[in-house]
Regions:
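Repeated scaffold domains used in trafficking and secretory/extracellular systems
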Residues: 53-62, 94-103, 138-147, 190-199, ...
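Blade-level signature of beta-propeller repeat domains, shared across WD40, Kelch, NHL, RCC1
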Residues: 325-336, 341-365
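A short beta-strand motif characteristic of beta-propeller blades
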Residues: 43-51, 84-90, 132-138, 181-187, ...
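Short loop/turn segments that connect beta-strands within beta-propeller blades
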Residues: 79-83, 127-132, 177-181, 220-224, ...
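Sec-dependent signal peptide cleavage junction
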Residues: 17-39
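Structural motif
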Residues: 72-77, 115-125, 158-174, 210-218, ...
Length: 365
């Protein structure tokens, strides 16, 4: 089944692994812009990589010797040297966290309530890295911290209802201060799917409500007129990542995997990078991606300068995507231990798949 990552909110990990893994596993959850509303009440699996669009992918989760990640209603930090995990914050039993960003002693992410196997009511949330001063900032998802502000997809819903409100709406891209004040509209739109911020510009995707057209736009971070970078009727570009003045994204492909493209930030010409490559991350001159083959998920990295591909071999079976930072990778793997009901492992290793260890475990619903 092709991963519709245009689409997620959680490290994020269709199995229903609901694991918020600081930017790591996204397992096929559709949640972005207008898709957020459409998918409330649908089972989803994510690792903090999760994405409400594709934005919920974790961003900058390493601070010093620690990487931060989440599993369901818990946020952890792991010492990359000792591989020891420590609980930072525990939410209520019906909450989940994903799409973590760590900045100046604070963790920013999306918090969402869970009803059965359904994810409902997303909020922009922050908590200190010592677990104190936890606070919901706004109704919304996919927070991006940039130059002293939080950019996010603002949502409207009645959280007093037992399940997602039928009037659930996407309002557009907004910004607010790091404490949740001075909330202002940047781009009013009910069809925003996902966005990224790069060099004082916002790049976002949207689907037409009246046609089959899908778009990739750019616009100044202050708002104003948006420029069409790409228009297509063959599916929505997704998994946006900016790197070295290019926007990389997934689009097209076959039943199981996306193809990988890039567009220079000052151009409208898309360039195919490679086929069958579900984009996970870009770090230090390498593109990290996964290839789905039936029930199997293989991981690769490709050097941008010469397109040399290397398979990343781990001692564990990867079940979802991953996040790369500071020479380390964190991902979700299959966990088989007859002495516990847990069947998903959080796995930390180097960027070659070596020196790995399961640093935490949890069970799918």
């Amino acid at each position: 089944m092709k991963k519709n990552k245009v689409l997620s909110l959680f490290l994020a990990l269709t199995m229903v692994v609901v694991c918020a893994f600081s930017g790591v596993c996204e397992a096929v959850a559709v949640q972005g812009g207008s898709n957020i509303a459409q998918n409330q009440g649908a089972s989803s699996v994510k690792l903090s990589n999760g994405k409400v669009g594709s934005t919920s992918k974790a961003k900058n989760i390493k601070s010093g010797n620690y990487m931060y990640y989440s599993t369901r209603n818990k946020i952890y930090k792991v010492n990359v040297k000792t591989k020891k995990s420590t609980l930072v914050y525990k939410g209520k039993g019906d909450e989940e966290f994903y799409g973590l960003t760590v900045k100046d002693g604070w963790i920013y992410c999306t918090k969402q309530k869970v009803e059965g196997r359904a994810l409902t009511f997303p909020y922009v949330f922050r908590v200190k890295t010592d677990g104190k001063s936890a606070k919901v900032l706004k109704k919304g998802a996919d927070p991006v911290v940039y130059k002293g502000n939080i950019y996010y997809i603002k949502l409207s819903f009645d959280d007093k209802k037992s399940n997602i409100d039928e009037n659930f709406q996407t309002l557009g891209i907004y910004k607010m201060s790091l404490s949740g004040k001075n909330d202002k509209v940047v781009k009013k739109s009910s069809i925003v799917e996902e966005f990224i911020v790069y060099k004082s510009k916002i790049y976002y995707t949207a689907m037409s409500e009246t046609s089959y057209n899908c778009y990739l736009y750019s616009m100044p971070i202050t708002g104003g007129k948006a420029k069409i970078i790409m228009r297509t009727t063959e599916g929505l570009p997704t998994n946006l990542i900016a790197y070295s003045d290019y926007i990389y994204f997934n689009w097209g492909g076959d039943e199981e995997n996306y193809d990988l493209y890039k567009i220079k930030t000052n151009s409208t010409k898309k360039i195919k990078v490679t086929s069958k490559a579900d984009l996970e991350d870009i770090y230090d001159g390498y593109i990290y991606y996964t290839v789905e083959k039936g029930l199997k998920l293989d991981a690769y990295k490709m050097k941008i300068s010469n397109k040399k591909k290397t398979k990343i071999k781990t001692n564990e079976e990867i079940i979802s995507g991953f996040y790369v930072e500071g020479g380390y990778m964190i991902m979700c793997v299959n966990y088989d231990n007859p002495n516990t009901k847990d069947n998903i492992g959080v796995y930390l290793c180097d960027t070659n798949g070596k020196n790995g260890k399961v640093i935490n475990t949890f069970s799918i619903y």
